[in-house]
């Protein structure tokens, strides 16, 4: 059955005509938008709210020591091999369940700490995924493994588990935005699919469309409103970037991707800016773009402090 178009709609965040309010009057006026009081129905926090308020986003970090030196650049490409380890470690019936879902409720990736040490981060987006995926890996019996492709053996030397309530999304959304500028680091190769083609560039519409789609699919199976997707392209500006192409091997295929950093500046009303901040918070767990479960699309977000306005001396 096709997913319903629902969730947060563009008209929930802003509407046409009228005079904008608040400290961003000029930017809102440029697009003819005005403030709407944030009493909207937030996807997953309306009639489904009681259940969703108990969900958590979790991140398990394993420090792994390896028995042979690894090039730092190579570590970020280990995702598919680590994904294989993950699938062999979790219950077989849950692996079958994962084959039936449109968006995987987890992401994972690895980053180098040194030539003989790496961090493997596994994030889950639901309580069930935490129990089925993180549970077995966080068990003391999971002490290490051997990567089949390279023969390199690993040993778990430390592990830590972070849990955040999904309701934090709503808290960020309803709060007044602290900033409208965000620096996003793309830690592992990132790419998007558009009209059957790979796009390996931090296009604002594709970045935030991806995050909104992942959020909607996980929370209640709904696609983001088309008008809202269009708003991502109109009201989020790529104000700085430093990226490089970085292909990602998945089996015999090579997926074109990019790594680096991009700075996004949000225009429009406060509600929209808060929504962008909430999506970025979620994205640090879900990953951004395609194949986040295979190790692509890992992001780290840094809110940038707004510039202080110079007040002329009397």
From Swiss-Prot:
Annotated region described as Disordered, given as residue ranges: 1-29
Gene Ontology BP term (one): defense response to virus
Cofactor annotation remark: Ca(2+) and Mn(2+) stimulate processing of pre-crRNA.
Impact reported for residue 99 to A: Incorrect processing of pre-crRNA, binds pre-crRNA
An MF annotation (GO) of this entry: endonuclease activity
Activity regulation info: Pre-crRNA processing is inhibited by EDTA.
Gene3D superfamilies on file: 3.30.70.1900
InterPro entries reported for this sequence: CRISPR-assoc_Cas6_C, CRISPR-assoc_prot_Cas6
Keywords: Antiviral defense, Endonuclease, Hydrolase, Nuclease, RNA-binding
Disruption phenotype: Deletion of this gene alone blocks maturation of pre-crRNA. Deletion of the entire CRISPR-Cas locus (cas6 to cas2, Rv2824c to Rv2816c) decreases resistance to plasmids encoding spacer elements about 6-fold.
CDD domains named in the record: Cas6_III-like (cd21141)
Purpose of the protein: CRISPR (clustered regularly interspaced short palindromic repeat) is an adaptive immune system that provides protection against mobile genetic elements (viruses, transposable elements and conjugative plasmids). CRISPR clusters contain sequences complementary to antecedent mobile elements (spacers) and target invading nucleic acids. CRISPR clusters are transcribed and processed into CRISPR RNA (crRNA). Processes pre-crRNA into individual crRNA units; accurate cleavage of pre-crRNA depends on a 3' stem-loop and the sequence of the bases in the stem. The mature crRNA is unusual for type III-A systems as it does not undergo 3' processing after Cas6 cleavage. Mature crRNA is about 71 nucleotides (nt long) with an 8 nt 5' handle and 28 nt repeat with a 10 nt stem-loop at the 3' end.
Protein name as it appears in the record: CRISPR-associated endoribonuclease Cas6
Species this protein is from: Mycobacterium tuberculosis (strain ATCC 25618 / H37Rv)
């Amino acid at each position: 059955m096709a997913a319903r178009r629902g969730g947060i709609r563009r008209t929930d965040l802003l509407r046409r005509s009228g005079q904008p309010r608040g400290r961003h009057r000029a930017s809102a006026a440029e697009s003819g938008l005005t403030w709407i009081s944030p009493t909207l129905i937030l996807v997953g926090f309306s009639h489904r709210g009681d259940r969703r308020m108990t969900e958590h986003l979790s991140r398990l970090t394993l420090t792994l020591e390896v028995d042979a030196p690894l090039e730092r650049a190579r570590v970020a490409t280990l995702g598919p091999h680590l994904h294989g380890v993950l699938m062999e470690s979790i219950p077989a019936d849950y692996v079958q369940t994962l084959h039936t879902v449109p968006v995987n409720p987890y992401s994972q990736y690895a980053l180098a700490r040194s030539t003989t040490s790496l961090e493997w981060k596994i994030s889950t987006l639901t309580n069930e995924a935490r129990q089925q995926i993180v549970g077995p890996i966080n068990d003391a019996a999971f002490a290490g493994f051997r990567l089949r492709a390279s023969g390199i053996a690993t040993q778990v030397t430390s592990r830590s588990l972070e849990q955040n309530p999904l309701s934090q999304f709503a808290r960020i959304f309803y709060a007044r935005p602290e900033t409208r500028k965000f620096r996003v680091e793309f830690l592992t190769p990132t790419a998007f699919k558009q009209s059957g083609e790979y796009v390996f560039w931090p296009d604002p519409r594709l970045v935030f469309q991806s995050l909104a789609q992942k959020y909607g699919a996980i929370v209640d199976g709904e696609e983001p409103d088309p008008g809202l997707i269009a708003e991502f392209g109109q009201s989020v500006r790529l104000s700085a970037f430093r990226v490089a192409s970085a292909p990602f091997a998945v089996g015999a295929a090579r997926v074109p991707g990019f790594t680096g950093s991009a700075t996004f500046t949000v225009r429009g009303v406060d509600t929209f800016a808060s929504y962008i901040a909430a999506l970025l918070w979620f994205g640090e767990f879900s990953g951004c773009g395609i194949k986040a479960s295979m190790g692509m699309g890992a992001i780290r977000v840094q809110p940038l402090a707004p510039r202080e306005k110079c007040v002329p001396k009397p």
